[in-house]
Every structure is written in C-alpha cells, then in structure tokens.
A protein has these predicted regions:
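Short loop->beta-strand "edge-of-pocket" segments that line small-molecule binding or catalytic clefts
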Residues: 166-168
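Amphipathic alpha-helical effector-binding/dimerization core
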Residues: 75-162
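Extended hydrophobic
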Residues: 175-201
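N-terminal helix-turn-helix
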Residues: 1-84
Length: 201
C-alpha cells in the first residue's frame, strides 16, 4: 500500500522560511538569511532572486524586504473571510456604544489572527491598537480564550501541544490546567476577559 502521509516540498518550505526571516529581521541580506536558516549563501541568494522576480521580495540598497505582492494575497484572504461581513455591523455598534477600540479575531492553524480593527473616540493608547494580520498565541488574549471555549478540551490541548503557552506578562496563563479552568469559566459566563495577560497597563 502506498504511503499516503503528507510530504513537505522542501523548496517551498525554504521559500516560506526566508520570507518569515525577512519579516522577523525587518529586512536582511543574503548572508544574514543564510546564517539564520543555516543554508548556503548562494542558496539564499538564488531564493531571494527568484522571490524578487516573482514580486514577493523587493531590494532597497543592499537589503531585501518582503514585497507588496503579499499584501494583495493578504487583503484577498481577509476580505473574503466570512467573519468580516458577519461581524462588522456588531463591531461597529459596540465601538460606537463604548468609544473603545474593537477587534475581530479568528483562529487560524492554532493562532489568533486579527481580521478587523475599529477605533473608538476614547481610544488614546496607541499600543493597544495592534495590527490587522497579527498572529498571536491563543492563551494570552480574551478573543483567543473566547474562541477556545467553543472547542473541545482535546482540540485545545492539540493547539497547546503545537504552539505552546508563552508568557507575555506575569499575568499570562501558562499552565495547562489553569487555562482549561479559565476556559470553563468563560463557558459558564459567556464572556472572556483579558487581565493584563497580553501586555501590562
């Protein structure tokens, strides 16, 4: 019987790792990418040249950066996500009523992704605004805990096993049993809270 387990395409994986490294490093040269990914400099250069020719990487002076072609794909994915159309009227009403900032988030492969942000009149603290497309850990955000409350405990554990439970502040829940207990409280209350778990203040 043939092996039907999924197999990774190494070259595609390397290309993705390079784009992720460019974002994490806020731009880099071929040598820095090679060191970061532990690949040959010539290999890194070939990938960067190919990505540049396809429009996914741009070069400014001697530094490569992620190209704006990714923005086209990202905006398409966001605008066609069903949550955008469903949530925006309610999100707008909530922001108008409270004057605070409102986020629409969704789980994607075990991470919490920001799909939409609407700012209210009272939101003066810029550090809380975030960015559309941000990918965060589920355990440290009210939105993440709210989403997890709709999942089975086994699915929650799968996400924890895959991504871990990193600490952002002293208040971040990093214990599995404590997180499951908090999620059970969210189920009972019907609402999740963030008690300085993602950032202080």
């Amino acid at each position: 019987m043939a092996d039907e387990s999924p197999r990774k395409i190494q070259s595609l994986e390397t290309a993705h790792r390079i784009t992720e490294a460019l974002q994490e490093l806020d731009g880099a040269g071929a040598s820095a990418i090679a060191d970061r990914l532990d690949i040959g400099r010539s290999t890194a250069y070939q990938y960067l040249m190919t990505l540049r020719e396809e429009g996914y990487v741009t070069k400014r002076e001697q530094t490569y950066h992620i190209g704006l072609k990714y923005l086209d794909h990202g905006m398409y994915a966001r605008d066609n996500h069903p949550m955008i159309e469903i949530s925006r009227p309610s999100l707008r009403d909530l922001v108008d009523e409270t004057g605070e900032i409102g986020w629409c988030t969704s789980e994607d492969n075990g991470k919490l992704v920001t799909l939409d942000i609407i700012e209210g009149d009272r939101n003066l603290n810029t550090k809380f605004r975030g960015r559309i497309g941000n990918r965060e850990y589920m355990n440290a955000h009210a939105g993440g805990k709210a989403i997890l409350s709709g999942y089975s405990d086994s699915r929650i554990m799968e996400i924890i096993d895959a991504h871990g439970m990193p600490s952002y502040t002293e208040q971040t829940i990093t214990d599995e049993e404590a997180l499951l207990a908090e999620i059970e409280r969210v189920r009972e209350r019907g609402v999740a809270f963030n008690d300085e778990e993602a950032m202080e203040g």
